[in-house]
Structure formats: structure tokens, C-alpha cells
């Protein structure tokens, strides 16, 4: 830290506690204004005089001044106060104009738009008021924050308004329709009820980024269009940042923190270049518009000017200032006339209820005269401007007729104001996106597509783009030559056979184009293109022998690999995204507008292109307030999704078709790290960890694929075995899907041997996990839970192992319970076999059974001898079913062959179970008859054709 002295002068008296003080320069650096929340007066200082001249004092408020705002041309000064009033003055004379609006609670922040025609005001009241500075009418109220608003900033072009509240939530408003462009929840520190500390957002002078105080004593930059985090400035601040301000050219930014430091940053280099330590916290700063100086004011009301803060060896903060012309009010705000008039009348009623002050506030009659005069003057000025351009505008009288038409037609419709206010909180539907694509960056290579197979990248060069296609495994795919892109493709999809590209519509002459490029073809000129008139391609996908494109007309167009137009389907809503895998195509569309809670309402449909069928349809599950960021198929073919809150879900046919959350970044995410999903399988998530809070990976250097274990968002259990519970649920899910595939394949007569082997291995692995959980339950005395786990065991030998385990742990009562569960399982198995596999006599006729039901023996401790007898009688049975297991259709197909190989009839087995001796002690359970076990194993070996009769745990 450089050693320098900065003398501060007292501008306002502050009591014992800290206050929030403000300081502003005018656009010519001739005057600066100061105020304090502990002082009802405003001081206008002479910025040109070298001597200390007394400031001009403005005394119109009844309580402390909490906020100041100057219009860009420095002709209007606005002030907000704890006395609930917003006042307007001429500047620099300080002549009072009017109480432009009132609140029911203290005001915290004010902001002018670029042209000075709108003033935004907010505070402890609900809602942000947009006030017409010409006539004082309230043109809109923006509602969406859940806490007092402490910061406001208009975008340089006047189309957007950024706001932040005490909870650290940022909302970006589109002023044309009053909807929220994006929401950044809890990204800034929570200031609570401390009114001397505020959160503030600040647009960069070029309008590309939004700077917000971060949670880690840093400044975080967000993208203007998407709200995605771009980068962060982190330096020597020891406590949270409480104020920030951009240099006029946007090359530098100054920040003040609760640690009483002011840091100067080089934004391009992302590092601090100078800092200054003060005696008190600096609560407001303002760059001098025409010099290398920064004015500061601390929490005690003392101000000073930090001269020559940017080193002379670096670019001056006044060089290269962006020249952005703000749009006129009528080009930005497209309000309904009726709503505008009703809100105006509502503001009049509020002012009538509050009463006029004694400081010279204008009456409403004078406001109307002011509005009439202003409209005429404004229209005359606009007419002269348009005449110079050779065009024309409506006359002033026509403009007045238009602005009052809604009021005349709907004289008594007072509900219109409330409808207008409610409409301002309408959230925006998510735009369409291509899975695996990154936003374009000028001069940088970006991804058009990135998946588990490979990637497609593009970079603009001399007016055209150069596209390159690479496979992660070079031996898996062919070498694809680079391509010159003359269309400006922004989306792509790749699989083993080819890749498809598309670009948006760029005017009437540049139509949206779809292009397919096969990797291998027996014929020349296999590439083909399609052009779309009057519609725009939003998303593309490809699969086995087909290419698909979804357009702005909600049309799903399916083409063959050769370019034949095969199918055209109308979708139910605007497309969000689409992805293909082999024969399947998944399409996500909007169902309706966003809910008032900012929840997206989406629907997915999975088509089988080769069969021309729709296999799945349902709603897309999302975390409340989040957006869909990725969709794809797992390696096993399960539809999967990932949202902006970091929750990965897999769609399963369980419970009639449901989404299961299999991963959440809330427990896995590291500091300053985001996960960009690429793919997944039954146990792992493949993603790219983006450092420094970047939302997308960079092409250079080549991103590294990160493998994360799937982890369900489980509740904290008293068992302390969350990893085992997570493993069990994942194995159950995988076993369920595998057995479902076995059933589906068996119904159509397809060989299922390989899948049955896989299912058996999963059963063994699942039982091992359950046995470990039983051990944990016994250690924590959770015996009821252990009994439930015993019932989930699939294989008979696993159940016997559980009995052995609890016996060794000296838990005889639990061993007795486990033994009874085993006996019930064996009886149920024999009873089911008697029903599904009836006995046949030598003539092939079904033998009628006298005993149709088997009475269960009393639940008591079983001997090893009786248990071995049961093993002997059930050696040829399939493994016992679990909650997830289904009866195998394939076994029914083999019924005739299996019936001829039975060594005993089912009647004999039932009688054998009934004759079990139940009087021996539990310790005999551990004694095994080796001869009987050998006989059982030999019996199992004879049935090796059934994969579910393999050797178990």
C-alpha cells in the first residue's frame, strides 16, 4: 500500500453511530453534491474553486437524506429521505421544483435514466416506482424483491434497470415490458437492517457487464444478456465490499469495503493496482468526469478527493469513454394508455391521502398544466428533428389525443392500474438453447457442440468462420477436415455418422440454413443444405439415420441422412431444446408462461424415429426458480436433465414415470467452481469443472473431463451411512431398469442371456451393500431398520449370511426375526411355484392339488438341519424377489423344459417344509452340513443355463 495522506473535510454532522453519506459530481466537474442520512440538508460544493468556499445548502427535507441522483446532463437533482419524500430540484441553482412522489416508508435509493426522463425510486416499500420527471406521474411499479431495495442502476442505453435488495438478490428488468430478464439470487452480502451499509449494482460504461459486490469480499461481473457470471475481482479486501464505481472509460473500478480500504482495480488484468486505508468506512465514491481523481465520503460525513490515483504510466480514466446514446422514453416504454392513466390516478389518490407539504409542492392542477406544456414542447422539438431528417411525426394534438384515448374510453375502469402493476412482475420464458454449445465470443473459439463422442468448435476469421470437428478418441471416429463457414452457424450436433449445423435468421436476405455433413458415404456430394423462409431453426439433433430441426414455427422437421424430408410435426409450444440418441429424439417445449414464482413450465416428448412412435411424454422437473441448462441421454439410454441450480435428474418408469434427482452440486461443489455437464452413466457424471466461476468452458486450453460419483440429495440420517444408502438406491434403480429391459426383450422373443447375467451381478452387488447397511444398523441399535433391510435381500445365501452376521454380533432376538423372514420367503416361493408351475401327469394333464394353500409355520428359531433341508428342496428355485424385482417372462417361456427336469414334485416340497423341527437353539444356525451344501451346489450347476442360479455372495 502506498504511503500517502488524504485530508478529509467535514460536510455533515454525524452523531455517534455511522450514517450513509452520498457524494456526486456533475457532468462538467464544476460542482459536487453531498448528503447524509443523519442530516436533512443537502450541500452543493464548488468544484472549481481552489479555496474553501461555503457550499450552497438545500433544506427541504424533514429528516436525513438517504439518496441523491443527478441526471446525465446535470440539470435535475433528486433527493430521497427518511421522511418518505422524493424531491426534485433544478441544478446547480438548487431551486426546488416539486415533491415528485411519496412512499409510506423511508426511501433508500434513486436513479435517473440516461435521458433524464425517468426517475427510479425505491426503499423499504414494496416495489420500484418509475416516475415521469416531466409531470410526476408514475408510469410503472416493478415488484419482485423480497426485501428493501438498496441499489438501482439504469443501463447506459436505458433499456434495462438493475436492482438489488438487502438479501443480496439482483433483478434485471426489461423496461419495455416490465418483466425480469434474469435473477441472481443471494449473490451479494446480506446487509440486514443496517441502513448505513448498502448493496449496489453498477453497469459498466459500455453496458456489457454488471458489477455486483460478491460474497467473498470481491466484485463479481455478470453478463448483460444472460446474467451468467463472467469473472470476479478479488484482492486485499478483508471484509465485504460496500460500494463500487466505474471509471468513465470502464478500464478501472474503485471499491470500498467494511475494512475501511479503497482499492483501485485494472478490470482487464483482474488485479488491484493501488489502495488507500482510511480512518472510517468509505460509504460512497464518485469519479471526476474530466480528471484522474476520485471523490470519497466516509460514514462520519467527511469528504475528500483522491488525486492522481491511476499511475501516469497507465491509460487515463478519461481516455476512450464509450459514447452510448440512450434511447428516448417512448422508444423504451411501451405502456398501455389505460394502465398509465390508472396508475397516474392511483398516485394522485395517494398524494391526496398524504396531504401537501408546506415547502412549495405543486398541486395536481399545476402538474396537469406542466404535463400539457411539456408534451407540446417535446413534440415540437421532435418535429424539428424529424423535419431535418426528411420524415414526419404526428402533431402535438394527435399525440395528446392518443395518450388520453384509453382514459376517455375506460373512464371507470379503476382495476386497470392493479392489472398493470401485476403484469409488471411477469417472468420471461427461457430461450431455446443447444445442448453442449457455448455463447459466441468475439475473437475466441467457442463450442458449437460438445458431448461424450467429440466436439465441434468455431472461430470467426476475416468475415467467415472456421469450423473444426474433433473426436475425443481418435480411433473411434474418422479424421474430419476443417470447414469454412459462410453461413455463421451457431449450433451443431454430432454422432458417429455425421454432424448437423444451423444458423439463426439474419434478415430477409440471410435465411436460416440447416446443413448436414456425413463422415462416411459411398456417394460423392453427400453434404446437403435446407433453407427456411419465414421460420428460424432453434435447435438441431441427429441420430441413427435421421436429422431433426425444430423451428420458430413450433415445427419438428425430420430428414433422412441423405436429405429426404420425411416427417413434419407440430409441437405444443415453443421449443427449449432437443437431443438425439440412436433411434430416439427428445424434445423439450414450453407448456405455458412462467409461474408467478418464476418457475418454468416445460414438457418433454421422446420419439422413436424408426418406429414413428412417441414412447414418453411428461413434464420437466426443475428446481424452483431455476432454468434448464442441459438435456441428454445416459450411456444406458435414460433421459436426463440438469438445471441451473446444479441438480441432475434421470427419468425412470417407476411410479408411472418420474424424475429422480441423482446428483446435486450443493454438496459436491467446490469454491469458485461450476460444473458444465457433458454426459453420465449409471454411477458417474462426466462434466467440465469451470474455474473462477465461469459458466462455460474455454476451447483453449483444452478442457479436462471431470468424473464425479452420482450422489443423491439425501437427508442427514442418524445411521451415519449416507454413502451406503446412496449406493443402495442407485443399484436398485439400475436393477429395476435392467429387469424391465429383460421383460421387454423376452416379450418379443429376443435373447436375454446377457442382460440376465448383468441383472444377477447387480443382485449380488446390491445384497453386499445391504449386508453392510445391516451391520451399520446393528452397531447403532436400529434393529427395526435392519429387519427392513433383511426383507430387501434378494438371494437366499445372502439372507443366511445376514443371520450368521447378527448371530456373531450376539443378537439372538434379531437372528430369530431374520430366520422367520427367511422361512416366510421360502414358503412364499414354494407357494408361487405351485401356482405358476402346476404338476403334470404322464399324460400331460394337470394334477389337481388337494392343498392349495400352505400354512406358515410359527416364527421361531430354526436349526441348521431344518434350514439345510429347505435349501435342498429349493435348490432349483430362482433367487428370491425384492421390491424392485419382477417375475421373469423368460422363465415362463421355458416352463415345459423346466417341468420335465424336476427331481421332486411341489407337493413333496411343501410337505417337507411343514415337517421342519422348530425346537433346536439358534446357535445351530451356524452349523452347515457340507455334504448337503455340496449336493445343493451340484444341483445349481446342473441349471447353469439360468443366470440367476449362479454362485452368490
UniProtKB/Swiss-Prot annotation:
Main location: nucleus
Repeat positions for WD: 15-55, 60-99, 102-143, 144-183, 192-232, 236-275, 277-316
Compositionally biased region (Acidic residues): 349-359
Keywords: Nucleus, Repeat, WD repeat
Biased composition (Polar residues): 853-877, 944-953
Annotated Basic and acidic residues bias: 926-943
UniProt-annotated location(s): Nucleus
Protein's GO biological process: response to auxin
Motif extent (Nuclear localization signal): 900-907
Gene3D superfamilies the record matches: YVTN repeat-like/Quinoprotein amine dehydrogenase
One Gene Ontology cellular component annotation held by this UniProt entry: nucleus
Chain intervals for the UniProt region annotation (Disordered): 347-370, 385-419, 851-877, 919-953
KO phenotype (gene knockout): Enhances phenotypes of the lhp1-3 mutant, thus leading to reduced plant size, early flowering in all photoperiod conditions and altered leaf morphology, associated with an increased expression of H3K27me3-positive genes.
UniProt subunit comment: Interacts with EZA1/SWN, LHP1, SLD5 and CLF in the nucleus.
Protein name, UniProt field: Protein ENHANCER OF LHP1 1
Species this protein is from: Arabidopsis thaliana
Organism taxonomic ancestry: Eukaryota, Viridiplantae, Streptophyta, Embryophyta, Tracheophyta
Gene: EOL1
